[in-house]
Amino acid sequence: AIRAASGLSPLAMDGGLSAAADARCESFVAGGAFDHSGMTTRSEICAAGPIGSASSVCSYWQNSPAHYANITNASFTSMGVACWFCSTAEGQYTYWTVTFN
């Protein structure tokens, strides 16, 4: 819906990009740096914390200029998605990653 509102085509789901997103979430859960230094795709957006739903994290990304720019980048044609849940010292966390190409 976000891309359509900007006059853009929807992104196709890509299994390879989803595998890359999954690997990023796994790295975060294992204690890897929560940044974009390990990115292996053209672009990615990530979120972490006690975020309980996909709609909550999507609202966050939509209201963040940098994340919104990735979602509405006209050069992207495909995406992959992953989400991992884990227990931390701060409580239950969810790690979300969307990769783009």
Where are these regions (language model features)?
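Functional surface patches built around histidine and acidic residues
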Residues: A1-N101
